[in-house]
Amino acid sequence: EICNEISADRILDAIQARPACRTAAVVFSGDTGFYSGAKKLNRLIEERAARDYETEFIPGISSLQYFCAKLKLPWEDVKVVSLHGRKGNIAGAVRNHRKVFFLTGGDSAVSGICRTLTENGLAEAVVYVGERLSYPDERIRTGTAASMAEEEFDPLAVLLVENEKVMRRDTVTHGLRDE
């Protein structure tokens, strides 16, 4: 039997409503350790039903991994910012890091992020947008923050921003230099 629930509470309720079911699989997209609903569901199972269930995580590929592979870019030096259901310092992240990956969602849509960058002096930052990644109608677009600010994008999108003009920070120390 297939249940289409997305809330951790409702997923656990659906499992518990079927006591004859000995094995259940809960499928989340992406990597279970990368901003996944698996974390909340596992915590809920531990709180409410630890004696009744044994959990196992089998991760998929995260949107970060997938998108960077499509772009042929390594991601070990990428700053990750989740704006999915939360706020973040968009301009600050881009000013301080050469590459920033944004998980979008809710009020933080791609065009809004690009507008924020443009309004904060980062109009020329290069923006890669991945829409509906891994679906047949997947689309990847590239432009500057300014050129993407008024475009329309699918709500199921991520973006990676490259900023060649990262703020240079000199280390400040107290006292005299060692010479």
Residue ranges and their predicted role:
Residues 10-19, 90-94, 147-151:
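Short amphipathic alpha-helix with an adjacent loop that forms part of the alpha/beta core around
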Residues 23-24, 96-179:
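A contiguous loop/helix-start segment that scaffolds small-molecule binding in enzyme catalytic cores
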Residues 33-98, 150:
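Class I SAM-dependent methyltransferase SAM-binding "motif I" and its flanking Rossmann-like core
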Residues 15-16, 39-43, 70-73, 115-117, ...:
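Short, glycine/charged-enriched secondary-structure capping and boundary segments
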Residues 1-55, 179:
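Class I S-adenosyl-L-methionine
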Residues 1-11, 61-63, 79-87, 105-107, ...:
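Short, acidic/turn-prone active-site loops that include or flank metal/cofactor-
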